[in-house]
């Protein structure tokens, strides 16, 4: 009986008029999906996270992205996210230019996680005691995504804040000086159609 009640709970609480209730609901659904994946990590429940990605309240959107980070971060669960990824990938990408900076930063972190998941060659592997970078193309994709977010957000005075927030989850990519130098030397910047702002080189450096 209790389990039956829990299964019906998200349908009500995800649409609650109070954003605090919606945020708590999404956070708990994410936990349930990780702990009881057989029962809750299904399209019937994933859709609630997908729908609330565009909730009008910042905290709800943040909880959604964090819940997804927990799911995509568990390789044992990612196979069940295939349909969700195909359905909501465009929306997840669009969140990197969210009007709320905290949401945008979490969205970038999520996409970095997904990038590493589907393009494992972008990770740094250690061979013979020396770090060797794999697939420059994957590194390039990461930087293009990050620079697109930085330019489109028009927050050029906050590059240091962005780097600080991404350092723990993408420190190895941010320290890819060779890749960064290659982007800086390009004549045709495919990631944007405007001159870099005053903080762009601080972001890259």
Curated annotation (Swiss-Prot):
Chief location category: nucleus
Keyword set, alphabetical order: Nucleus
Gene3D superfamilies: Leucine-rich Repeat Variant (1.25.10.10)
InterPro entries for this protein: ARM-like, ARM-type_fold, Cohesin_Scc3/SA, HEAT_SCC3-SA, SCD
Subcellular localization: Nucleus
GO CC, one annotated term: nucleus
Keyword Kinase recorded: no
SCD domain span: 10-95
Pfam families: HEAT_SCC3-SA, SCD
Record family assignment: Belongs to the SCC3 family.
Name of this chain's protein: Putative STAG3-like protein 1
Gene symbol of the encoding locus: STAG3L1
């Amino acid at each position: 009986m209790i389990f039956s009640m829990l299964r019906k709970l998200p349908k009500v609480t995800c649409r609650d008029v109070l954003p605090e209730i919606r945020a708590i609901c999404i956070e708990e659904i994410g936990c349930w999906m990780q702990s009881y994946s057989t029962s809750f990590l299904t399209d019937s429940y994933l859709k609630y996270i997908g729908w609330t990605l565009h909730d009008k309240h910042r905290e709800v959107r943040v909880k959604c992205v964090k819940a997804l980070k927990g799911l995509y971060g568990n390789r044992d669960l990612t196979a069940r996210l295939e349909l969700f990824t195909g359905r909501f990938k465009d929306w997840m990408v669009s969140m990197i230019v969210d009007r709320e900076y905290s949401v945008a930063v979490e969205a970038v972190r999520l996409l970095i996680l997904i990038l590493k998941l589907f393009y494992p060659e972008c990770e740094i592997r250690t061979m013979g005691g020396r770090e060797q970078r794999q697939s420059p193309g994957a590194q390039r994709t990461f930087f293009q995504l990050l620079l697109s977010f930085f330019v489109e957000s028009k927050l050029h005075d906050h590059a240091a804040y962005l780097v600080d927030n991404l350092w723990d989850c993408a420190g190895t990519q941010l320290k890819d000086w060779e890749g960064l130098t290659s982007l800086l030397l390009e004549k045709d910047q495919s990631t944007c159609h405007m001159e870099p702002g005053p903080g762009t080189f601080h972001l890259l450096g």
